[in-house]
């Protein structure tokens, strides 16, 4: 009994001189054939289907590399749609590289820009916040470090404008009053202390 579908054999490296009858006459020596098909567009290969797989394998072993009408034959068992497998691999690998690149560009563009923006004002703004809370820096020192339009934007973000001017005037006034009162009390007490001794 033959195989249910037969076994197809690929025959390559054919010249224009090789015809269907030539292949059929050569391959039928090794077993019963179901069909012989020669490609014309593009030319150069053919398929020969054997009824029995054992006969097909024997023909491949003997005829592969042999010469027929000036053609050095390439004869092997047909593997079935090998082109799709080769085409699928590179497409998958190429698709994965395009997504990481786009992802890298997108994330790098937005993330890097945000990082540079934070980095340009992050250290000075953090020092400025500590300066406001401790009452040692004031608005004048903040403006001196930053200066220009960038200082104006950051004063709005970190409580500048009226708040900074009110704080600077209030802190200087309170500091002056405190310093004056403490100095006055110290001077007023020192003569009394000396008089007692």
UniProtKB/Swiss-Prot annotation:
One GO biological process term: regulation of mRNA 3'-end processing
- PTM comment for this protein? Extensively phosphorylated on serine residues in the RS domain.
Record's keyword annotation contains RNA-binding:
yes
For this UniProt record, give its keywords in alphabetical order, as a comma-separated list.
Nucleus, Phosphoprotein, RNA-binding
The Basic and acidic residues compositionally biased stretches are 89-102
- Cellular component terms (Gene Ontology): nuclear speck; nucleus
**Where are stretches of biased composition, namely Low complexity?**
117-144, 166-176
Phosphothreonine PTM sites in chain numbering: 106
Residues annotated as carrying Phosphoserine in the record are: 168, 171, 174, 188, 190
- Annotated region (Disordered) at 74-197
Which branch of life, at top level?
A: Eukaryota
Supply one GO molecular-function term: mRNA binding
- Establish whether keyword Phosphoprotein is in the entry: yes
Give the matching InterPro entries: Nucleotide-bd_a/b_plait_sf, RBD_domain_sf, RRM_dom
- The primary site where this protein sits is nucleus
The chain positions of domain RRM read 7-80
* Compartment(s) where it occurs, according to its Swiss-Prot or TrEMBL record: Nucleus
Note one Pfam family from the annotation: RRM_1
Annotated family: Belongs to the splicing factor SR family.
Purpose of the protein: May control important aspects of development.
Q: What is this protein called?
A: RNA-binding protein Rsf1
């Amino acid at each position: 009994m033959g195989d249910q579908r037969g076994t197809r054999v690929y025959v390559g490296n054919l010249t224009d001189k090789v015809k269907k009858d030539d292949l059929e006459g050569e391959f039928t020596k090794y077993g019963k054939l179901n069909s012989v098909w020669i490609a014309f567009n593009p030319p150069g290969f053919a398929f020969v289907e054997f009824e029995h797989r054992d006969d097909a394998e024997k023909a491949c072993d003997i005829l592969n590399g042999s010469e027929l009408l000036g053609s050095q034959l390439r004869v092997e068992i047909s593997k079935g749609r090998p082109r799709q497998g080769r085409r699928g691999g590179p497409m998958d690998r190429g698709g994965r590289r395009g997504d990481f690149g786009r992802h890298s560009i997108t994330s790098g563009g937005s993330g890097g820009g945000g990082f540079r923006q934070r980095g340009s004002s992050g250290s000075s703004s953090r020092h400025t916040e500590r300066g406001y809370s401790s009452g040692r820096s004031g608005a004048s020192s903040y403006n001196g470090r930053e200066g220009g339009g960038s200082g104006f934007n950051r004063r709005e973000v970190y409580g500048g404008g009226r708040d900074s001017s009110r704080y600077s005037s209030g802190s200087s006034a309170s500091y002056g009053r405190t310093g004056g009162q403490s100095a006055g009390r110290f001077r007023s007490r020192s003569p009394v202390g000396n008089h007692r001794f």
